[in-house]
Amino acid sequence: MSLFKKAADAVDAGGIKGIYENVYFDRRTRVLTNCVGKMIPENAKVLDIGCGNGQISSMIVAGRPGIDIKGVDIMKRKEKCFIPVEVFDGEHIPYEDNSFDTALFVDVLHHIPDPMIILHEAARVARKCIVIKDHNADRFLGDITLQFMDWVGNARYGVVLEYNYLKRAQWEAAFSELGLTVSEYNNSLHLYPGPVDWIFGRSLQFVCRLDMRN
């Protein structure tokens, strides 16, 4: 068993998962709804890729009348889905070119061994832009910090944890290869309350909007 896994099990015995569910999860949902929603164009038709139960997208729609969002995921959640969801194979999006104004990824790409495959697909189906919420691994002990957060937040749902965290320069190289321009970027999300953000925040999380080059 890895040192990381031992540490994660130890803190779980102290109720960290319960704290995550009761305090952090609700705050994260509210903050991400605001940060992500602001980057989506007015009256956009959006595809949420890897949408889970679609809760964040449904909250964006509630606060931004005129936006329409549907989702795709590799499995459909047993619990309630808040938006229409279609199951797909994780690599081939089942829509024609330019079917949507915007493609959306919220904490999805670091779970994929080769995110470029699905990013190419997102660029194919989106006419205007791609909005991404994900992680930067640039900071001191960034990888370990992100692994811990990922495990606490996702392991209990059976999510495959690839721990595939890129540094900002790697993200920018990927976007350039896809012919995308970063038009908006925010790495001060403040997902965590108070001093906790000094440890788990510190620019490890970002939201960006990528526009298609003409």
Question: Which residue ranges define each predicted feature?
Answer:
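A conserved beta-strand element that flanks and buttresses the S-adenosyl-L-methionine
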Residues: 104
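Short catalytic micro-motifs in class I SAM-dependent methyltransferases
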Residues: 107-111
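Conserved beta-strand signature within the Rossmann-like core of class I S-adenosyl-L-methionine
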Residues: 128-135
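A short, conserved alpha-helix within the catalytic core of class I
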Residues: 112-121
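Class I SAM-dependent methyltransferase Rossmann-like catalytic core
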Residues: 5-31
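Class I SAM-dependent methyltransferase SAM/SAH-binding core
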Residues: 53-92
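C-terminal alpha-helical "lid/dimerization" subdomain adjacent to the S-adenosyl-L-methionine
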Residues: 58, 135-195
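Conserved class I S-adenosyl-L-methionine
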Residues: 43-52
